[in-house]
A protein has these predicted regions:
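Acetyl-CoA-dependent GNAT
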Residues: 2-108, 119-121, 125-131
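Active-site acidic-Proline motif in GNAT/NAT acetyltransferases
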Residues: 106-108, 112, 143-144
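Residues forming the Rossmann-fold NAD(P)(H) cofactor-binding site
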Residues: 116
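Conserved beta-strand-loop-alpha-helix junction that forms the acyl-donor binding cleft
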Residues: 133-149
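Conserved active-site tyrosine of GNAT-family acetyltransferases
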Residues: 152
Length: 156
């Protein structure tokens, strides 16, 4: 495997359009929202005062992916009612968390270790508690996304 220079760069005027143009494979399109939709969601969520962080994932100067997370302690408005009504949710409700909301590597750059390294850096960023302490980190993924599940489980 080639040596990587993976790092996270906050979304800005210089990189947002390139991030919007990133794509996953056809099979993966049902696993993650488009980056354009994700940035719109981030804008709306942040306009309500929720801390949202959106990053381009870069290898050197090349944008290879996108990651977005938020901080909160309230799940009001969350789309997955099945989870909100679960016993597991009751354990977490009202406790501060970081939610890895979006995570993707462009189809041209998959299989090179960029996902693993950038996910590690995402967790390292969260450990700085940029919006305050949190008791847990949560993410969601489609059950058919076997590659994503394997990646996330490798971090515990």
């Amino acid at each position: 495997m080639k040596k990587t220079n993976i790092h996270l760069e906050k979304i800005n005027w210089d990189n947002y359009y390139k991030v919007i143009k990133l794509r996953v494979t056809k099979e993966q399109e049902n696993y993650v929202a488009s980056n354009k939709a994700s940035l719109i969601h981030a804008f709306v969520e942040s306009s309500d005062g929720t801390p949202v962080y959106a990053f381009a994932i870069k290898n050197g100067k090349t944008i290879v992916g996108f990651m977005q997370l938020m901080y909160g302690d309230d799940w009001t408005g969350y789309e997955r009612e099945d989870w909100l009504n679960s016993e597991e949710f009751k354990e977490y409700n009202g406790r501060p968390y970081y939610y890895i909301w979006r995570f993707m590597i462009d189809k041209r750059y998959q299989g090179r270790g960029y996902g693993k390294e950038s996910f590690k850096q995402t967790l390292d960023f969260i450990k700085t508690f940029p919006s305050g302490k949190a008791e847990y980190v949560v993410l969601s993924y489609e059950p058919k996304n076997v590659v994503g599940k394997k990646l996330y489980e490798s971090f515990g």
